[in-house]
């Protein structure tokens, strides 16, 4: 074989090999959306084959399974049975151990304002029918709040009769994290999980722009945008579930010490590698006064945050030292 023919043959082999590599490593975007956790959940990923589409469907199955476990609104869940005093103790599997460990940490850091034993108080407030509970009912419910009253062993947790848990301030973030873990474990390298605006991005090379809803404007009007790569972004705001009566805004983020909606912030956005931390801290920081919230956030290496609050009817903000690198 002549030298020229050898060179041409080698080039041909390289071209074929590259074409084969490109074919088998070709990716395309795949979207799937379902209604879970009382919101619209969207999973968008880069995949290489139709087989990977099944992974996304299985991810939704996992999320649904976790929702059924952690929800206090699913009557068949162990949490609901525990809340109804149908069972004396709640068995702690790995998911619940994680949930309670995070809850305990934030309870301590927030001067007892972040409290997942707020379930009975939360049940009092009817935001759909715009009902303000009576003072007597609120005081009665406050008596049933207190994370430090839970009794733990290695395997179970017990509570006082009448106390109710509500994991709504961190369950969504926890489920998002588990969904991302499952996707990655099954070969999905890049994408995001978005549950009603609570989002976790993974495997992305380029930053994704995330809008921060303006707390006093129409839906879709922004107070700013973030550019993030492989982070979670979660916002808690007093504009999500609320009603206004006699000029007072009543919203769903309740202060467990007063029994009424917190009047400290109007919106808190938290960035973290873990969605569960972004979710939980967005509530915890909301319950603190703005300066306390930012002081705490600056001490927590795993998060950055921006707090919007009202001062003389004007919206102002405070942010952590590192937050500006994400702001546009």
Regions found by a protein language model. Name each.
Residues 2-328:
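Mature catalytic core of soluble alpha/beta enzymes
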């Amino acid at each position: 074989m002549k030298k020229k023919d050898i060179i041409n043959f080698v080039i041909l082999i390289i071209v074929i090999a590259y074409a084969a590599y490109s074919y088998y490593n070709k990716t395309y975007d795949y979207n799937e959306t379902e209604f879970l956790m009382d919101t619209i959940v969207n999973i968008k990923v880069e995949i290489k084959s139709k087989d990977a589409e099944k992974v996304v469907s299985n991810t939704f199955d996992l999320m649904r399974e976790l929702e059924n476990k952690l929800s206090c609104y699913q009557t068949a869940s162990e949490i609901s049975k525990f809340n109804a005093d149908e069972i004396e103790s709640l068995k702690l599997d790995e998911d619940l151990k994680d949930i309670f460990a995070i809850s305990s940490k934030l309870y301590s850091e927030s001067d007892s304002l972040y409290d997942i034993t707020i379930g009975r108080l939360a049940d009092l407030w009817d935001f759909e029918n715009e009902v303000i509970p009576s003072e007597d009912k609120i005081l009665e419910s406050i008596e049933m709040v207190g994370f430090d009253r839970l009794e733990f062993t290695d395997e179970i947790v017990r509570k006082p009769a009448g106390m109710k848990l509500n994991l709504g301030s961190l369950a969504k973030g926890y489920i998002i994290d588990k969904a991302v873990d499952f996707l990655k474990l099954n070969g999905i390298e890049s994408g995001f999980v978005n549950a009603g605006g609570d989002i976790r991005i993974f495997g992305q090379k380029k930053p994704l722009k995330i809008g921060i809803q303006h707390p006093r404007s129409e839906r879709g009007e922004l107070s700013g945008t973030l550019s993030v790569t492989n982070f979670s972004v979660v916002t808690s705001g007093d504009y999500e579930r609320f009603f206004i009566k006699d000029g007072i805004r009543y919203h769903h983020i309740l202060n467990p010490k007063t029994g009424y909606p917190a009047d400290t912030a109007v919106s808190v956005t938290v960035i973290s590698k873990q969605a569960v931390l972004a979710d939980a801290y967005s509530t915890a920081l909301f319950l603190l006064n703005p300066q306390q919230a930012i002081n705490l956030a600056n001490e927590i290496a795993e998060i950055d945050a921006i707090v919007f609050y009202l001062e003389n009817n004007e919206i102002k903000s405070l942010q952590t030292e590192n937050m500006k690198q994400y702001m546009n």
